A protein has these predicted regions:
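Short active-site neighborhood of thiol/selenol oxidoreductases, capturing the structured segment around
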Residues: 32-50
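Thiol/disulfide oxidoreductase modules built on the thioredoxin-like
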Residues: 34-35, 102-138
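Boundary at the C-terminal end of the N-terminal hydrophobic targeting segment
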Residues: 7-11
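Short, internal strand/loop/helix patches
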Residues: 70-72, 87-114
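Bacterial N-terminal signal peptides
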Residues: 1-6
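A short beta-strand-turn-helix
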Residues: 20-37
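Structural microenvironment flanking redox-active thiols in thiol-disulfide oxidoreductases
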Residues: 48-90
Length: 148
């Protein structure tokens, strides 16, 4: 029971302001979470990241940005050599930016299932609501509803 205490302590509450952070994307370009961000997508595993990729398949470049959405991928468990030599270079072909949490500084702030994509809906930097998506179809539908 005590082992669950850290998860409870980290749980986000509606109305809570998200602490700003800065991560590098797959092009080593910095991104800082700001009040303009309306949707934060968090993937804690390769399977969850693949859901995002499938949901964004065939979408034009700038699709997430037009929706004021940001995608964070937790890649801390990926061996650094694999990330550097193969995974991150492959991500450069994506039509969307991926904020890479290489050291687990950001994704653990937002508790959720490892195999699902966490959707945090924000307004002026505060959490309005959150959802988890287990399929690419569900995530795609939600993104389509988040019209620019």
């Amino acid at each position: 029971m005590l082992s669950l205490l850290p998860l409870w302590a980290q749980a986000l509450e509606v109305g809570e302001r998200l602490t700003p952070w800065t991560l590098l994307d797959q092009f080593d370009q910095a991104f800082t979470l700001e009040n303009q961000t309306q949707t934060l997508l968090v993937a804690r595993s390769m399977d969850a990241a693949k859901l995002v990729g499938a949901a964004l398949q065939d979408q034009p470049k700038g699709y997430l940005e037009a929706r004021h959405a940001v995608f964070v991928a937790d890649i801390q468990r990926m061996p650094r050599l694999i990330a550097k030599m193969f995974a991150v270079p492959a991500m450069r072909d994506y039509s969307y930016r991926v904020m890479l949490d290489r050291d687990g500084r950001v994704a653990p702030r937002y508790p959720g299932a490892v195999d699902k994509v966490l959707w945090l809906q924000l307004k002026d930097g505060q959490l309005v609501e959150q959802h988890e998506y287990a399929t690419a179809a569900q995530l795609r539908e939600a993104l389509e509803k988040a019209l620019p």
